[in-house]
Amino acid sequence: EVLTIDGKNAEVFNLLGVLKLQQNDVISAINWIEKAVEIKPDVYFYETLFQAYVRAGLFKQIVAREKEVLEKFPDNFSLLFNIALANKKTKNIKAAIKFYDKALKINPGSYLAWFNLSHLYSIEGETENAVSALKICKKIRPNDIDTDYFLSLALMRTKNYDKGLKLFETRLCRETATALQNKTYPNKATKETLWKGENIKNKTIYVYYEAGFGDVIMFSRYLPLLANRCGKLLFLPQKQLVPLFRDNPLGIDVVIDKYIPECDMNFDVHAPLLSLPYLLGLKGDKVFAYPEGYIRPNKELAEEFKKKYFNNDKIKVGIKWQGNTYYDQDRVIPTKFFKPLMAVENTQYYSFQTFEGSE
């Protein structure tokens, strides 16, 4: 009714957009708010419009309005934050860093701005800056698990393995793995029996997988070191990796390939696999146990695969283009980018992609 009287009432157009946002009709909301901005370029209208663009994933529209917004409102934190976010989402990393810096000069207490900035520093290989940003995050939210986890990774990238491995104990997959074992063996796999690095020379330790196949293969390098410290080593890998550890025992006494009832499961202490470098107290370069290699292929399988797939004189290249996007959206490489590589003469490419992304 107001618009029939005043067809250019920016406040009403913006209010209609806000109401549409509340109804999750984001595209209609954007149409209304864009009209409000055209009539009256008010800072509040721009803030609402950028929020709607973010909800719709229309980050290019934010970047397109970057210049006009900065000319009018160069010191608005909300607008600068969303411009930085839009550049981050559109892979314009250096611009994103610049705008997060500008936003933080206005509001230095923004956890999200520091957290996002730390991620961008990591992408750019500026690991010391990433650590500094995450330390500020930790001051803002001292008990935040995500901060501790990403700070652990950043510290290890700067080769500060002592502090990094300690904070790595906050990782979510550790909690998931120990909780699952506690549910499976409620009377034995308890918090009290978690191995804390103490002497277990004459004791049995039960180590179990966590995270993905690659993590288990990489961290299995610590099993021989653990075997030298304990009386007996039980290891539960993912079912698909059981044959690999049968061929490469790595000091394991029992590779568990099926469910064992609690009454038949005997161990003194237990630990998730990815905790081993920390629990073993490895320092400095000792973290990289067995750099010369510790996993060997099954000779019969290797010969079979050679005849079936690799019976050629070309340079053989295995590729994988996608990780688990539930945890990290940045571990995806569009397959089109491999095309120039495949044009190189005398090469043969093999897909190692499984599960998500294999389609």
Range-by-range predicted roles:
Residues 1-359:
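Alpha-helical solenoid repeat scaffolds of the TPR/TPR-like class and their adjacent stem/linker regions
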